[in-house]
Amino acid sequence: MLVKIVLVVLLTLALVFECFSTISVPITIGLYISEYNGYRFGVFGWCKVDRSVCSPIRIGYSKDDILLFNEQEYLHLPNHAKYALSNLLLVHVLAFVCVTILWVFGMLTCFRCIKTSRRMLIIAVLWSMLTFMVTLLGFLIDILIFSSHVTWCTWLTLASAFFTVLSGTVLCVMRRNLTYDKFLESKPEKHGVYVPLCRLNDVEELEIPWCNTMNHQALTAPTPM
């Protein structure tokens, strides 16, 4: 039960943190992944700091957008990045989709039919690895385009990647525990019922056959004269 709670919390944090950078300007004025030269940049466009002008909602920046509003002003990207690089911000959308799917996997582990499926857990572990790589790639793209002008939304993307790794580790632990339980169920019973240590309520419930045999031999052995 505790493992499931930890998994759900980690995946929820990863989803929320990735959502902050995805719904940045111009969708949400208060969230932006970079601020430079009087402009705030987001995944789907940019806005001026005074909120008087915003670009259309789309992937990629274009210098033609600002020229439509003011012919004497030119939109410069931080670090002298090329406008074509801004198309790579699509990775943030892909990362959000991947984290959402992984979050759904985490919710499905609450159901017994999914939790006891080793194949489903393997798929979830592999998907968590893919999600981590895509999320980390989104963070690196922000650093590449905006350099030192990134804001806290970009660092939340890195935190989302970190929580994704932790959730993948928890999924691996769940798969290992499931494999161990399957092994105990399929092992032939030679000396009574096998009880997992984690399910014992009292140490006295654990009966070790070879100890009992040695005690019996000690009791029945003849006493030396």
UniProtKB/Swiss-Prot annotation:
Membrane topology: Multi-pass membrane protein
GO CC, alphabetical: cell division site; growing cell tip; plasma membrane
Keyword annotations: Cell membrane, Membrane, Transmembrane, Transmembrane helix
Keyword Cell membrane: yes
Transmembrane segments: 5-25, 88-108, 121-141, 154-174
Localization annotation: Cell membrane
Domain of life: Eukaryota
InterPro entries named in the record: pH-response_reg_palI/RIM9 (IPR051380), SUR7/Rim9-like_fungi (IPR009571)
Residue ranges, Extracellular side: 26-87, 142-153
Principal subcellular localization: membrane
Membrane topology (Cytoplasmic): 1-4, 109-120, 175-225
Family per record: Belongs to the palI/RIM9 family.
Protein function: Required for the proteolytic cleavage of the transcription factor RIM101 in response to alkaline ambient pH.
Identification of the protein by name: pH-response regulator palI/RIM9 homolog 2
